[in-house]
Design a protein with these regions (language model features):
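N-terminal targeting or regulatory segments adjacent to alpha/beta-hydrolase or S9 domains
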Residues: 21-144
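C-terminal catalytic histidine-bearing segment of alpha/beta-hydrolase fold enzymes
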Residues: 43-73, 304-344
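Short beta-strand element of the alpha/beta-hydrolase
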Residues: 156-165
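The serine-hydrolase catalytic nucleophile loop
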Residues: 169-177, 195-196, 291-294
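Short amphipathic alpha-helix adjacent to the substrate-entry channel of hydrolases
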Residues: 172-190
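Primarily recognizes the serine-hydrolase "nucleophile elbow" in alpha/beta-hydrolase
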Residues: 206-275
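Short alpha-helix in the alpha/beta-hydrolase fold that links the catalytic acid
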Residues: 276, 290-300
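Short beta-strand/loop motif that positions the catalytic acidic residue
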Residues: 280-282, 286
Length: 344
């Protein structure tokens, strides 16, 4: 009997040790679950270096604190909207932040931020201020401007993407960053401009100057570039795409006119013989930009001998961006083909 009692006590002790270990492991797992959901790690490169990737549950604060984004991370998000560091990337990717926009995709926000971080981790420069330090010292508002660079092939033309926002904020995460990323799939160099809503045209003029003057350094072609924009950004692209306006706003005659302007959902109606070849699209349910106004302007450009292409999509509202998952999906291919047809 004593031998059986001894075995029972030993077995009970082993069970208690096992239960304690399981409880400790469960506690450790629970304490790290929130962090693991917000950030995941992937291996990069032959040396098995790791990069922590953001997820939908990552916060704006975590993005801003990442060394990859140095002192310009706040420009990833609209500085003129109420975006707090506690907001998740899912929270910030809504029409509550990006007013007037539709078809916003939170997963695209995550992909964009991870793409830029990956480039920075690989030693690539992802942001270029367009103003000198002395200019920023004289006007602090110029600190909130610059070009995010998404990559591209050396020697190929560049495209500057200009988001809308009603000239009250810059909706880049939905209306220019996705475009700048998408264009790299075609080998072209994608830049997205962060501008001052109160001085948007001057900032785009400065951005064009910067890229043209630094083309060799940046390994991009200064010829055959294109200007893209949605809503307010489309007005910017059309205005600086006009040869006369380009010369006036830059004060220079040596910078070539854009080979193409790509416009989305805008009621911009001005036209002249100095306008660039233009591709445009819009939805029939756009309550801000009438498709008939856009069509009428392009018809007038055609009458002046300027090449155009126009698409209107049934049922789409304002600000559909790339149009992924909508009847507009694929328009980007058409716009690229149009741009390429205008290259000299």
């Amino acid at each position: 009997m004593n031998r059986f009692k001894k075995r029972a006590w030993v077995l009970l002790g082993l069970l208690l040790v096992f239960a304690t270990a399981c409880s400790r492991n469960l506690d450790e797992t629970d304490s790290s679950t929130g962090e693991s959901r917000r950030m995941v790690t992937e291996e990069k490169g032959s040396e098995q270096a790791t990069m922590t990737k953001f997820t939908l549950e990552s916060t704006v604060g975590e993005v801003l604190a990442d060394p990859a984004f140095e002192d310009f991370g706040h420009l990833l998000f609209p500085v003129d909207r109420n975006v707090t560091e506690e907001m998740s990337l899912a929270d910030v990717s809504t029409s509550r932040v990006y007013v007037w926009y539709n078809n916003i995709q939170p997963e695209k926000t995550v992909a964009i931020i991870n793409h830029l971080k990956s480039r920075a981790t690989d030693g690539q420069r992802i942001f270029y201020p367009i103003y000198e330090e002395e200019e920023i010292a004289a006007d602090s508002a110029k600190a909130d401007t610059g070009l995010f660079y998404f990559g591209g092939e050396a020697g190929k033309p560049f495209a500057i993407m200009n988001a809308g926002g009603g000239f009250s904020y810059v909706g880049a995460m939905h209306d220019s960053f996705p475009h700048a990323l998408a264009i790299t799939d075609y080998g072209y160099n994608g830049f997205a401009l962060i501008y001052r809503p109160d001085d948007a045209y001057a900032d785009l003029a400065k951005a064009i100057e910067y890229l043209y003057d630094h083309a060799e350094e940046l390994k991009v072609s200064g010829e055959n570039y294109s200007l893209w924009g949605g809503s307010a950004g489309a007005r910017m692209a059309a205005t600086l795409g006009n040869g006369d306006s380009l010369s006036q706003l830059t004060g220079r005659k040596d910078i070539p006119q854009a080979a193409t302007v790509v416009m989305q959902y805008t009621g911009y109606s001005a036209y002249s013989p100095g306008d660039a070849p233009t591709y445009a699209n819009v939805g029939t349910n756009d309550g801000i930009a009438s498709w008939r106004t856009m069509e009428s302007r392009l018809q007038r450009l055609e009458s002046l001998g300027i090449a155009t292409e126009f698409h209107v999509y049934d049922g789409l509202s304002h600000g559909f961006g790339l149009g992924t998952g909508t009847v507009a999906e694929g328009w980007f291919d058409d716009a690229i083909a149009f741009w390429e047809s205008q290259m000299k």
